[in-house]
A protein has these predicted regions:
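Acidic/aromatic-lined carbohydrate-recognition and catalytic surfaces
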Residues: 1-170, 184, 195-243, 378
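Generic enzyme active-site microenvironment
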Residues: 62-63, 191, 229, 312-313, ...
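C-terminal beta-strand-rich structural cap/linker in extracellular carbohydrate-active enzymes
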Residues: 498-519
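Loop/helix patches that line or flank the sugar-binding groove of alpha-linked glycan CAZymes
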Residues: 220-222, 242, 270, 291, ...
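Beta-strand-rich binding/interaction modules
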Residues: 475-495
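Short loop/turn motifs at secondary-structure junctions
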Residues: 10, 30, 186-188, 312, ...
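Active-site-proximal helices and loops of the catalytic beta/alpha 8
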Residues: 51-55, 68-69, 77-87, 91, ...
Length: 519
């Protein structure tokens, strides 16, 4: 029902968080059946119908593939645990009867937690099963790790199989079968959860990279039109490993946090060791660009023409742009201009196009913990359920944060100056201008040591644009090497561009930004 709205934004692909049958202990990332849509969403037929309807509108559909583990309720795990060594799934998981004293201590400490099932502490789970006393987990106890083998098996640990062993090879075939099953139904790609962590004891990710290169070769042979997107967060590793797209997000290579995570937010606190102090996109104007620019420039230079870096506005795992004191439409327009003018593939998290806010202090549900505030219902219209559902408000998955109905699609559709319509304008310009699209060139023009404003160039052929961003609350200016005459194509706040012989001067009022076409 909402595909026409998505099409109206100019969106050409959607990524759905986990929709396969799940135990729902971790928001769908504990899969019971990879070949079945969870009944809470519908049926496999419903998914096929969604894909067909999306394709009719020029929208591709990508699904979430949790490749590293399953739910303990998965039939694979149940059969493996039963101890039939001739069973198909016997070696799909990592079982042992002996673990180190340190690992036993970790189990004991986890069990002292008020809710041990929600603790990610330790490596193993103790179980009374014919197959073994312990299995290796990835995160929660209900998420047993699939057995992709060990890059360097410990000769003293008989359960650590090499990647070439029958069990790990069978798991690889199963993952190909899953992808093939859904590709054949029209799915256009997969975002692979924690893609770098499949092979155990793999420093440098050499064997994990080999695995994904094999998957890529298989995909390119049989499904060349489909894409693989990794949650690796190190494009320099992920793209040569075979992925078409990798993210720069809240973990992995550093830089994203320094842009958006203020120290007094949950994610600012969790990234306190990143060494950036204040975040860049804050009206206090005390942030730095160096960490982001150094790491992005390195990754961009090493992966250009091989694949794409994606810098998402947010995702299900961390905060939205609208959080704390970054909460006005002008502030959010400056951040949206950044997301939609950088090279690579932009990802807009649902609701960020209307400025939905991260809702602080929500209770955890289905493993959300402090991620709950970024998983609230989409806000279509004013009201207690925001048009998301006709149910009673108390029955919603999480409560709505409508901000008195202002941050809704219906309110912003009517306002030509809204963030929603501004986002549409940015996407239209990105589609229309080759220099601004995924493949256009990129170069920082301003001085990284003078962070405000940030000015970068996008170019393709004879077409050039400069993007100037000032998220601080004060007026700023910068002199840059002469580029030409700058004409504002789109912007927010008061800006000016004065062209000189040797230098050009860009001036921006507080919380302002602009895209300049250079003539």
């Amino acid at each position: 029902k909402k595909l026409d709205y998505i099409q109206s934004l100019g969106i050409t692909a959607i990524w759905l968080n986990p929709v396969f049958e799940s135990g729902w202990f971790d928001g769908g990332y504990d899969v019971i059946d990879f070949y079945k849509i969870d009944p809470r969403f519908g049926t496999n037929t419903d998914m096929v119908n969604l894909i067909k309807a999306a394709h009719q509108r020029g929208i591709k559909v990508c699904l979430d593939l949790v490749a590293g583990h399953t739910s303990t309720h998965c039939d694979w795990f149940k059969e493996s645990a039963n101890g039939d060594m001739n069973g198909r799934y016997a070696d799909y998981y990592i079982w042992t009867d002996t673990i180190s004293e340190k690992d036993k201590e970790e189990i004991a400490l986890r069990h002292k937690d008020p809710n041990p099932q929600s603790s990610t502490r330790g490596r193993y789970v103790e179980i009374d099963a014919p197959r073994g006393k312990y299995y290796e987990k990835n995160f929660f106890e209900c998420q047993p790790a699939l057995n992709y083998g060990f890059a360097h098996p410990d000769p003293h640990h008989s359960w650590e199989e090499p990647v070439t062993a029958p069990g790990p090879q069978a798991v690889r075939r199963e993952i190909r079968n899953i992808m093939s099953f859904w590709f054949d139904k029209g799915v256009d790609g997969f975002r692979v959860d924690m893609a770098s962590s499949l092979v155990k004891n793999d420093p440098g990710k050499k064997e994990t990279s080999k695995l994904w290169n094999e998957m890529r070769a298989w995909k390119d042979k049989y499904y060349p039109q489909c894409v693989l997107i990794s949650e690796w967060s190190n494009p320099v590793e992920a793209i040569p490993a075979g992925f078409n797209i990798d993210f720069m997000i809240h973990f992995g290579i550093k830089g994203y946090a320094s842009l958006f995570f203020a120290p007094n937010t949950p994610w600012g606190k969790s990234n306190a060791n990143d060494g950036y102090g204040e975040c860049y996109f804050d009206k206090a104007g005390k942030g730095t660009l160096k960490q982001f620019i150094d790491n992005f420039s390195d990754a961009y230079g090493k992966t250009k023409d091989l694949g794409y870096i994606a810098i998402p506005s947010a995702n299900h795992d961390y905060q939205r742009p609208n959080i704390g004191t970054r909460n006005t439409m002008d502030q959010l327009k400056v951040t949206m201009m950044f997301f939609l003018t950088m090279p690579g593939v932009p990802f807009i998290y649902y609701g960020d196009e209307i400025g939905m806010k991260y809702q602080m202090n929500l209770p955890s549900k289905e493993g959300s913990n402090n991620r709950a505030g970024t998983r609230t219902p989409m806000q279509w219209m004013p009201g207690q359920t925001a048009g998301f559902s006709t149910c009673a408000p108390s029955q919603l998955y999480f409560p709505v944060a409508t901000d008195n109905g202002r941050l809704t699609v219906s309110a912003q559709e009517k306002d030509k100056s809204s963030l929603l319509n501004y986002t549409r304008a940015l996407i239209r310009l990105r589609h229309a201008a080759p220099a601004l699209n995924n493949d256009g060139g990129w170069e920082l023009i301003s001085n990284v040591n003078q962070p405000y404003p940030m000015v970068y160039k996008r170019f393709s052929g004879g077409e050039t644009y400069l993007i100037a961003l000032n998220p601080s609350g004060r007026k700023v200016s910068v002199n840059i090497p002469h580029q030409g005459k700058g004409i504002v194509k789109l912007g927010t706040g008061k800006v000016s561009y004065k062209s000189g012989k040797a230098f050009d001067k860009i001036q921006l009022n507080g919380i302002s930004s602009a895209i300049f076409s250079i003539k």
